Amino acid sequence: MRAPPLLLLLAACAPPPCAAAAPTPPGWEPTPDAPWCPYKVLPEGPEAGGGRLCFRSPARGFRCQAPGCVLHAPAGRSLRASVLRNRSVLLQWRLAPAAARRVRAFALNCSWRGAYTRFPCERVLLGASCRDYLLPDVHDSVLYRLCLQPLPLRAGPAAAAPETPEPAECVEFTAEPAGMQDIVVAMTAVGGSICVMLVVICLLVAYITENLMRPALARPGLRRHP
């Protein structure tokens, strides 16, 4: 049985379902008793070992939900970046318990690609208890690269050789221009309004056809006699 044209039009103009939030896999959500994260933003130059000690609380209950957030998570990696609409990026990572016991800190390096070379944007030293970091004020339409490297514990006097540091994991992303997002939202709203108007017009035409024109067509014509 074929569906009526009006039902097909309603199905075509129906708004798309809301985008579901990106699920949080086990290990990404911080535990309720997770400690505060100590970190230092390291300056560029010869005094790179300085920096003011700061603290941040873990990002509990965070969900990356479109269109206000875009998730960049390379397959098989323990590092992911959530690019928010306010031009900030939440970087999250996870470690196995055995590997976490061998880490004394994390080194985060940020860079962005220009026309001919890459430019550093931020270097952060994070404590071993840190599992996320918020990078504020990224530029639109610029390819960023964030690399996180676990730093092993310092070898004691009895150790034969220092432990080799693990390789850094990196994630790349580009922040979408906020103006383009507003244009997309506006076009979606206008398209939805046009669909609603078409549905109303179709309903009016169907009502006029069923209730006004059919009785007039069914009424027999009156013939005039001389």
UniProtKB/Swiss-Prot annotation:
Transmembrane segments: 183-203
Primary location: membrane
Domain of life the protein comes from: Eukaryota
Pfam families xrefs: Fndc10 (PF17742)
One cellular component term from this protein's GO annotations in UniProt: membrane
Segments in the Cytoplasmic topological domain: 204-226
Topological category with respect to the lipid bilayer: Single-pass type I membrane protein
Glycosylation site positions: 86, 109
Leader sequence residues: 1-20
Keywords: Glycoprotein, Membrane, Signal, Transmembrane, Transmembrane helix
Sequence ranges assigned to domain Fibronectin type-III in this UniProt record: 74-166
Stated name of the protein: Fibronectin type III domain-containing protein 10
